[in-house]
Every structure is written in C-alpha cells, then in structure tokens.
Amino acid sequence: MSAKSNKIGVVQLTILTMVNMMGSGIIMLPTKLAEIGTISIVSWLVTAVGSTALAYAFAQCGMFSKKSGGMGGYAEYSFGKAGNFMANYTYGVSLVIANTAIAISAVGYGSEFLGATLSPLSIALWTIFTLWLATVLNFGGARITGNISSFTIWGVIIPVVGISIIGWKWFDSLMYVNSWNPHNVPTFEAIGVSISMTLWAFLGLESACANADAVENPEKNVPIAVLGGTLGAAVIYIVSTNVIAGIVPNLELANSTAPFGLAFAHMFDETIGKVIMGLMVMSCFGSLLGWQFTIAQVFKSSAEEGYFPAFFKKVTSKDAPIVGMVTITALQTLLSLMTISPSLNKQFNVLVDLAVVTNVIPYLLSMAALAVLLKAENVAPQKYKTTVFVAFIGSLYSIYALYAAGEQAMLYGSIVTFIGWTLYGFVSYKFDLKKSQAN
C-alpha cells in the first residue's frame, strides 16, 4: 500500500478539525450568554471571524516553523528565548485555569443531574474532588486517557449538533426577540461582555494544524480544512446557543447550571433532560481527563527545554508525569478555593475570563512573530502578504478580547504575566548568558 493511500483528504481533515474544536467549552455558554441576551449573536459573529483568522495563521505557523514547542517555538522567531518562555508559561497557566472551569462545568451538570443544591463551598470542594479524580486516573498513562476522551467527546457533540438540527421545531421567535437585550445594556458593551465567553469555546484552535503530516498536499489542504473546520464549528456554536434562547425563557436559562439539559427537558420531558445532563457530565469529565494529562505534558516539555523546574519532566514507567500532575492539581485546588463565588455560574465566569486573558498572550506573541517566521522560511511573497494580513486581523481580535474580558481579568492576567517575567529571570542564564558569551 502506498504512503499516499494512508493520507487523509481535505474533507476528512475538515471534519476532524471541527470535531477536535468542539469540546466541553460550550456546555455552560447558553447560561452566560442569556445574562446578556440574544444580542450575543453579534459577539459570536465577531469571534467567528477572529477565530478563523487565528486558526488560519496558526496553520501557517505549524506548516513552516522549524522550531519545536508549538506557540513557544513560533514566538521565538521574533522574541527569542524570552518570548518562547512567556508563550509556554502563559499557555500553561491558561490551561491550569481552564481545566478548573471545566471541572466546575462537570459539577454544575452533575448537581442538576442528581437534583442537588450546592453551597459555594460545596461547589469548590466537589470541583477539587473532580480534579483530583481526573488526575489519579491519569497515573496509568496516556493510552487509556486518550481512548476514554475520544469516546466521551460525543457526549457533547451529539446533543449540541442535535439541538442545532431539531431544536427549531420548539423555537419561539417572539421569545428570542424579547430576549435581545433584556437589561438594556449599551450595544457595544453588550457585545464586548460576551466576547471572552464566545472565544472560550474556540480555545484549542492553535492546534488546528496538528494533523498536517497525515494530509495529502498539506500546503493547500491544511489551510482549507482549518478554515472550513473553524467556520463549521462556529455555525454549530451559533445555531445551538441561539436556538436554545428561543426554547427556554431568558430568566430561567440565565439561572441554569445545566442549560442544554434544561433545553431538552423543555423540548421533550424531564427524563430526556436528565439523559442529556448525564451525557454532558460524562463528556465534561472525559475532556477534563484528557486535558489534565495534556497540561502535565505541556509542563514536561517546557521543563525539558529548561524553562520550568526539572521535577515536571519526571515520568513513571508508564510515561506518566505524576509529580507534575500532582503539582498542577495542587495549584488548581488553591485556585478553586480562591475563586469561591456566590454561585457556580459566577465562579465559572471568573475562571473563563482569566483563562481567556492568559491564553490570548501566546496568541499575540505568535501572531507578532509570524512575519519573521515566514521570512526566515522563504515563503512566497503573495502567501507572505496574505498570511501576515490575516495574522493582523487575528491580533486585532485578540487585543479586543483582552479589552472585553474586563478589568478584574486583566488585572489578574497582568499579575500572572509579570510573575512570568520574574520567573524567566531565574532561568534566563541558561539561554541569554550563552548568547552573550558567543558574542
């Protein structure tokens, strides 16, 4: 059998990209967006354009970069080892925060599924338990985790795609219109408030080109698949969250901790709603399981490069970085306690805004370095101009996302970033001293 026959085509890669992008990030979004109103559809459209630009630019980064380390390697083209460190550091921190938010999503759906009412402290404690359970289950290595995650992802995809297709039968256009801007917030402010939540659903787009080696004619097909996959995910996100807004009354939706389960209960009955909640809990935990291992691998890779402490690269006989996983989960435990809020939704919102801010920093570093990356790899002039322009659009959107995340998220995000620069000072001798001596 030839090597070419083992390659996947552009349609297959488009579907794969779309499925990989559709994780557990969406399952709490209808609630958050209901707090703003159906005007949030404008935020979805803005984010769809911005995310597509970012995904396309990252596809080009992945295709042409000769440096390892993902976004850190891209950033190094312009910002040297300091940029590489900061991209890895802020990305790692964002994943630590994001996983805590995913755990809270699982707790929210789980409490609704079991009919339990949780106090703020109980929410934090159950979140901590969920995080540690996912960590312990990862001690067996990546293979089991990968198999479970590839199965449980369908617990999100089936309900989300399903409601996008059949939900229109129960859609009430008058309810949707009346929910447009229930609190009469100024239009620009209302759109901005929703931006970080809509971007949250697309986090992970930076890995859109991860399957480039398995594709026929990657230089042509990978960008097409990335654009198609990102736009496809955007359509499903926009349709699913907006159709729910025409099925469930705005006030009820805004106070729910399991919006998709609530929507299916309105469409059918309580039993179906419970089944959907169960699927979402399963999917959320499966996603958490995979991401907890991924975070440990990100920290392990950074430790191997000399950026993070050496204990992060210690692995067991099953290649599981247990010391790193335990350290990361201890940080998440602290984060869960520090962000205790009056309600589960408020705690989720705080974590999402902070995760988005810290995740956008490596996005900006990568976009800013793309021009140098393309020049260094002698990319054709027309492709260079197109890609740099698209990266500029992605950068503008990223800056807007930072602004829209709010003062609190920007304050904490800035502190996290300044801590990063301080930490780099303690490891920079490994890189910058060698450079000075060479000169």
Located regions from the model:
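Membrane-interface "cap" regions at the ends of multi-pass membrane proteins
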Residues: 1-31, 35-39, 51-56, 68, ...
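Hydrophobic transmembrane alpha-helices that form the core helical bundles
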Residues: 31-35, 53-131, 135-139, 144, ...
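Select transmembrane alpha-helical segments in multipass membrane proteins
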Residues: 7-17, 80-94, 126-130, 185-198, ...
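Transmembrane alpha-helical segments of multi-pass small-molecule transport proteins
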Residues: 12, 45-46, 113-144, 157-165, ...
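TM-loop-TM module centered on a large, flexible mid-protein loop between adjacent transmembrane helices
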Residues: 73-76, 80, 112-116, 227-289, ...
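Helix-loop-helix junctions that connect adjacent transmembrane segments
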Residues: 2-5, 40-41, 115-122, 150-278, ...
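A generic transmembrane alpha-helix motif of multi-pass inner-membrane proteins
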Residues: 165, 358-359, 385-439
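Helix-loop-helix connectors at the membrane interface of multi-pass transporters/channels
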Residues: 76, 103-126, 159, 214-218, ...
